[in-house]
């Protein structure tokens, strides 16, 4: 809201998980965070979100949302990883300094306490790798990655365990603000698929 966006929330226990046809139709960007209750999300809602992403809605998947039905469906893989929760330090390195998502950041920033995610992360090779994380226990992780599916842009961003104040961190907030602007594609041109009539006369040959 501080960046001038019209923001609303949708939760699991709402009818249709708050993701009604109208909400999805009006959304330029959807941020998805989930934990433990991934299987409780109705497949019909997942399919509607999937269709909207293919049609151009941006999607930002946060932290344990890597196991969400929608992320798995879009990735086509298991999206599994290593994890450990002991409150260790995470250092996020910017590995694509020209990317709009990292605008205003230094070459790295740190979170004093976070859950560890470690490789191998079972996702397709990212189209753009934006962040790599190093953890105090020695692991590394591809913690900021972008994809395109249909007309939609997707950004996966690793930090955000619920027991730590990660989303109060100024750098994390900056990344999310930048990512919202990057994944949004309002006004993208419509394309026609299937059989089409020619737009110019075609002369008979032979």
What kind of feature is each model-predicted range?
Residues 1, 6, 83-158:
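Catalytic beta-strand/loop cores that center a nucleophilic Ser/Cys/Thr
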Residues 3-16:
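A short beta-strand-loop structural module common to alpha/beta enzyme folds
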Residues 14-17, 35-39, 65-69, 108, ...:
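Solvent-exposed loop/turn segments at secondary-structure junctions
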Residues 37-105:
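A glycine-rich, often tryptophan-bearing local segment used as a flexible ligand/cofactor-contacting loop or short
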